[in-house]
Structure formats: C-alpha cells, structure tokens
Amino acid sequence: MLSIILLLMQLVAADIAVVGPSLDQSFDASGGTAKIPIQWLFTPNTPSQDDFTSLTFSLCSGPNYKIEAFKVIGKLSDIGTTDFEAEVSQSVGANGYYYVQIYAATTDGYTIHYSPRFKLTGMTGSKLPDTLLITAPPTPETRVTTGDLGATIDSKSFDIPYGEQNGKAKFAPMQTQPGTKITATTWSRRYATSAVSFFTSLTATPVQHTTLTPGWSYYISSDYNYAPPAPFPSDNGGWYDPKKRQSFTTRKLNMDKLRKRRQTS
C-alpha cells in the first residue's frame, strides 16, 4: 500500500501541452490535401521529454465522450522537435470539425493529448465528422507503469490557485455548468484579487506558453443556424402600399398663399 502511495505522489500529469492548431481554425483540402501545422511544448512535469520514444498523430472527430479516429496522419521518432505538419487527404471524411490526437509513447507507458477543434473544408469523403463546434477538447490521459504496477494519473494541478503557479504551462479550473435560472439579486466576487507585475523591457523568451483546462464533465454544443435568411418584405408578401394605410387623403399646400395669409393676419 505504501509503495502505491509513493508512486502516485511522484507522478504528475501535463507532460505535453498542445498549442496548435487553434480553436475554429479552418483548413481547405479542395486541392487534394489539407496541410495542418501541429504545435506542442514539453512541460517540466513527469513524464519528461527524455522519457518519450515516439509521437503518433491521429485525425479524430466526435464529442468528447465518443472519440472516433478517422486516420493516422503521422508519426515522429525525433522527440527533439515541437512541431509537425500533417497532410490530410480530402477523401478521409466529409466537411466538418476535427481534432488531432497526440499519442506519446514512453518507455513505461503513454500519454494522450488532444488539440482544439478545427474545421476542414473541401473534403469529399463519405465518413461524417462532427458538425458541432465544442470549445473544450477531450480530457488528456496519462498512464505510466512501473514494474507490475500501473496507475492512471489524475493531475491535481488544476486545484492550485492560478496566481500561485509558475512554469511554461498553467492550469485553470474547469468551467462550471451554467444554471437554468438566475436567482442572485446582487453580485459577489468569486475569487480574491491577486497582485500583478509588468515587464519593464522585452524578454528574450516567453515565460508562459499556454494555459490548460481540464475537460468538462458535462456536454455543451453549438451549431450553425441552418434556417434560411428571411426574404425582403416585398418578396414574401409582407410588403404593402403605404397609401392603403392612410385614413385621410393627402393635400398639396400652396406655400405662397399660406405665407401671404400669415402676413395679413
């Protein structure tokens, strides 16, 4: 039992942070293929960069609770790099929203991370992706095995107050699910204020590269408004002649006579 506790205390998640492509970015495959630049960075947590042996990139779609892999689009054995340009054939699937799964293999296990959702257009495949833009990517997964003992790692980094964190990647708490009714009559501050300091000159390298948030424990989706735009009133029968709404007839005024009448009165 003690060995299990010590193992879990030594393991921390957030080994890789995916920073590109960005949310709702669009790529066109009408020329036959779409080139997708994938970017990530290594954080100073376990597993470290030296522990990884390969990275496998898969094109996925679907909601966070039902991930569907469409095709493996690349593999890297050179872990020294932090970017990769994947080519996606237009026949892989239809137009819609996709995301990239990065499977990072280590000597003792693996980690799985996901990019934000992006849009692919010009696709000709019959396999249908998700047409909904879900802002949060699927929850990362980390599994490391030591000897005969395996453990699924659940990071506690999200519980540390944001202002007290440092390092290349920071962790924000999960957004809470909005309620269905508004009951508050006054507002109150949810989190205490924190101090802020500013750089007095340009820095050579970024201090912080990205902010990570855990996957939602609930499902919120959005979609396009597929209703056709309403036609102009003159096109849909709603137009009318203003004269039909007049209760009195219009009259022309002789301004010269009216002016003379005012002068003599």
UniProtKB/Swiss-Prot annotation:
Residues 1-14 form the signal peptide. GO terms for cellular component: extracellular region. One of its GO terms (biological process) is (1->6)-beta-D-glucan biosynthetic process. It comes from the Eukaryota. It is found in: Secreted, Cell wall. It holds the Pfam family Kre9_KNH1_C. The keyword Secreted applies. InterPro entries: Kre9/Knh1 (IPR045328), Kre9/Knh1-like_N (IPR018466), Kre9/Knh1_C (IPR008659). O-glycosylated. Keywords: Cell wall, Cell wall biogenesis/degradation, Glycoprotein, Secreted, Signal. Residues 231-265 are annotated as: Disordered. Belongs to the KRE9/KNH1 family. PANTHER family: CELL WALL SYNTHESIS PROTEIN KNH1-RELATED. Involved in cell wall beta(1->6) glucan synthesis. This is Cell wall synthesis protein KNH1.
